[in-house]
């Protein structure tokens, strides 16, 4: 029996200004869906896997074909509904409604666990959408680079006087998200040793210039890190190995990194974490044949790694969970103090969220890198005083290789996002850009996620697990006229631990797009300021007042 999720075909997004659909509002999701499965973008495109363990773009290849065919014929007063990667309906709406509404991996809370999801998954009744895999706005490892860079820079400010020169970061995982870490570290001025069990992933990061070197030897890796830090160089190396073995070995040797974190796919104990002592081939085979055995040994292995991270923390080394839920897995395995070290959001990122600042991103549907160069210049023009952002854009231009359609990630917030969107739309209208632009973001944003072990960890008012906020975010983006809106469960940290929403909007150069952009790109980050103001953060309260937000129960207006 053939596997409906495996096909050797190669998918790449169309380029240029010729339409394959009836309008750019349907061409945009078509191209971004296909871009998610570009072999230069996706982790395992032949299996529909984009990143993050089993984060898929469509449920089966037949469903992918149905989505593509439907988008090509969809009218501008119709909306396609996608249920866990399956196109289930087309309904008459109106021109300002989203062209696509997506719900992925959502389960009633009592059943929201990996065991139940995996049962549904085997029957082709569900699909894990991760965050940007099933919402068709993944742009490769660049999508997380700036957030990781901001995290490392803030860690440098807090712990090392704002200077990471001559220091190094230990981490694990070089997948779709973790692959950003070495480059982000180097951009922040540090060296990086990244442990990765799957050599093909390390090779992918080498090919796309996200990591500088590769080795199979821990001794060689440490020697290079030592030489680079002494010389004040910022370079990175991938070590082929198992983080659950390497981290404890470094503790045993008394090696002291300057920062420790991890971005293995620990959120998925079957498909995301190599058990200690296993080969990758053995692991892949047993994922299908004996997933319970894989999960049992993988969880025990995570406990070993987290214990090593605790040892680093107790030695005074800044250590953070980078949002893969590895502490939770270790806690469930009996490591009672697994949460002694913090997550990266409460440690370094939350003040940005309080101002609605997060991972704003855009992609050039033309496929021409020059369109991104022009939009980069426009960002600098509109935000002339943000030198930190200018520095990021300069480094991104120099260091980041585009994957698939050219794209840019750029952390900006409430008050700036809508200005950039309107400017990009004007550039499309006057012909400065060769084709429309799509603007989206990660689901990891200030108002679009409830994830008590990651984005909403340790909220000031204890509202970590309240998931009304991402639901309201999705509803508001739908009402505001985003081109497509998504609502997912389990991204980043796994089943039962998160709910989150995404949006993408197309700049097609029309005046209708101006109105939609102004609404969506104001309202979307404003929900983040609202959420944090409601939790009692002074930064958010002040920003809400400054931006004139009307928050009756919060500001009394």
From Swiss-Prot:
One Pfam family recorded for the sequence: Urocanase_C
A Gene Ontology molecular function term of the record: urocanate hydratase activity
Keyword Cell wall biogenesis/degradation: no
A GO CC term attached to the entry: cytoplasm
Keywords linked to the UniProt accession: Cytoplasm, Histidine metabolism, Lyase, NAD
Span list, region Disordered: 1-20
Protein name, as recorded: Urocanate hydratase
